[in-house]
Regions:
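Active-site catalytic loop in hydrolytic enzyme cores
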Residues: 1-42, 119-124
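CN hydrolase (nitrilase-like) catalytic-core segments centered on the catalytic cysteine
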Residues: 30-105
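C-terminal beta-strand edge segments of enzyme domains
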Residues: 14, 76-138
């Protein structure tokens, strides 16, 4: 990729779109919780994640850890149970899942849904306080 002019980035951009604030992880990025956290801290409400394959539990974990929707898209054959094309909710559950290879998944989500957990209060508002970005003052 580097020889073709693609270089690694050093930022985690979030884009304002007509359907919400969108961040993106690419494949291996999703294996590290810090990537989704940086996107969430920057205001992402939805994180798109094209990924060749991995344990589907990672998509649920990234959604739950950061109270964002994860939209995973994979080339993997669903029958291998290696990754899913799906929309994942705030609690880490798949809201919609592709039933076969090569299909599209659609799910309506509520970006205004409360991020309140009974024992923690407004969970998403607490994230920057508990896991601040390294080197940045609140």
């Amino acid at each position: 990729e580097i020889s073709a002019g693609v270089a690694p980035g050093s930022d985690y951009p979030v884009f304002d779109t007509r359907f919400g604030k969108l961040g993106m992880m690419v494949c291996y990025d999703g294996f590290f919780p810090e990537v989704a956290r940086q996107l969430s801290n920057r205001g992402a409400e939805v994180i798109a994640w094209p990924v060749w394959g991995c344990n589907p539990a990672l998509a649920g974990a990234r959604a739950c850890e950061n109270h964002v929707y994860i939209v995973s898209s994979t080339y993997e054959d669903i029958s291998r149970n290696w990754m899913l094309t799906a929309v994942w909710g705030h609690f880490g559950e798949p809201l919609a899942t592709a039933s076969e290879w090569g299909t599209v998944v659609v799910s309506e989500v509520d970006l205004g849904a409360a991020t309140h957990w009974n024992s923690l209060g407004d969970y998403k508002a607490q994230l920057p306080r508990h896991r601040p970005e390294w080197g940045v003052s609140p």
